[in-house]
């Protein structure tokens, strides 16, 4: 049976990290974070918890980017007290919502002016280009300090920042190669990207990192995970070749 590419990155019972290592739990948590298009941000409102819907995007190093308006209460909270947490969730395995994989990341948030980070955010949330340059909007970066990952019912892991975050050297290596990877795949292998996307239309690779990559078609963006973290451009090529073969084999089986 061909291996189907992992899409949307929700851990399932078959890859339960509780049955493996803490590193596997960290990888599953990163998959959820990098795939998340919506999350719940918890800030402090004069000492009281305040929960807000936000649209996160992960930088290559897993810091969490959020485009926030200063008109929003949660932004004012962060400016007064940068300590916060964010919850993102996957898809439940059954009718019981407690089977939903989820991760809560705690840390501190700061406003930043970084064109590369802004481009990263807009690659994940292209619709936000409509208001990203409004005067009241700023990009914030949440630096993870620790996390609580729950792979499903009664499958919890506490992860410190050092365990959760990807290898810094690998992050830097892939980040340095990313532009070349995107250009090569988009210009030379659009058919492979279409096979992996398994959906009509022209798909472009818009990000690549140690944990996976994102494909976009207009404002639709899909996340795909590697089978394991990669550390080099060669590792990415190996993963993409395997995913393309698996996707094409699956397409043949279903037609």
Model-assigned labels for residue ranges:
Residues 1-255:
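Binding-site signature for planar aromatic cofactors or substrates
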């Amino acid at each position: 049976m061909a291996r189907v590419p992992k899409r949307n990155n929700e851990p399932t019972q078959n890859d339960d990290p509780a049955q493996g290592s803490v590193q596997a739990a960290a990888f599953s948590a990163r998959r959820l974070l990098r795939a998340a298009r919506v999350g719940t941000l918890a800030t402090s409102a004069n000492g009281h918890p305040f929960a807000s819907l936000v649209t996160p995007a992960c930088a290559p190093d897993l810091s969490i980017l959020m485009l926030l308006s200063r008109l929003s209460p949660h932004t004012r909270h962060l400016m007064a007290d940068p300590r916060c947490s964010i919850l993102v969730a996957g898809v439940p395995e059954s009718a019981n919502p407690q089977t939903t994989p989820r991760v809560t990341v705690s840390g501190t948030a700061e406003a930043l002016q970084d064109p590369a980070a802004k481009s990263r955010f807009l690659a994940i949330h292209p619709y936000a280009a409509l208001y990203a340059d409004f005067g009241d909007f700023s990009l914030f970066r949440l630096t993870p300090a620790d996390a609580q990952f729950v792979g499903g019912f009664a499958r919890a892991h506490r992860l410190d920042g050092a365990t959760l975050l990807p290898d810094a050297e690998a992050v830097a290596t892939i980040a340095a190669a990313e532009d070349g990877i995107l250009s090569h795949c988009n210009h030379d292998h659009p058919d492979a990207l279409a096979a992996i996307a398994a959906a009509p239309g022209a798909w472009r690779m818009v990000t690549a990192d140690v944990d996976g990559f994102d494909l976009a078609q207009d404002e639709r963006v899909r996340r795909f995970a590697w089978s394991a973290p990669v550390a080099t451009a060669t590792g990415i090529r190996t993963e993409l070749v395997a995913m393309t073969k698996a996707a094409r084999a699956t397409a043949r089986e279903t037609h």
